[in-house]
Amino acid sequence: MDDPKNAESLLAIWKSYDNGNVSAAKDLFADTISAELGDGMIVRSSRDSMLAQVQAVRNSFKSAIDQVDAVMAVKSTDRNEHWVLIWGTETDTYKSGKVDSTHLQETWRFNKNGKADLVFQYKRPGTPPMRSK
């Protein structure tokens, strides 16, 4: 296990996405971020560029709600690295009214300054919401 402050930072990052204001978590990211996303995209860019891209995705939704199932901070003792693992389900409502959900598992690395600098994302489609009768 590792210092829970990094897990708290990751929860704040997820919350800023839900709230539609990813820049609120800007100070939790390193100057350069690498990401391997669940759709196969690999990105390495500046913090501001990455956050602008994420904000553009978030802006395509009317709402986004993340339900966290588990989060834990761990330390890689052989590399002296700090990681946070998170599992959850994201339910997005498009501006058209369509609702979609995705099950997520993300592995985030935090540098020695407590800033996120790397994320691996794994995802699969969620079960469609039950239709009301």
Where on the chain are the PLM-derived regions?
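A solvent-exposed, acidic/Ser-Thr-rich amphipathic alpha-helical stretch
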Residues: V22-V74
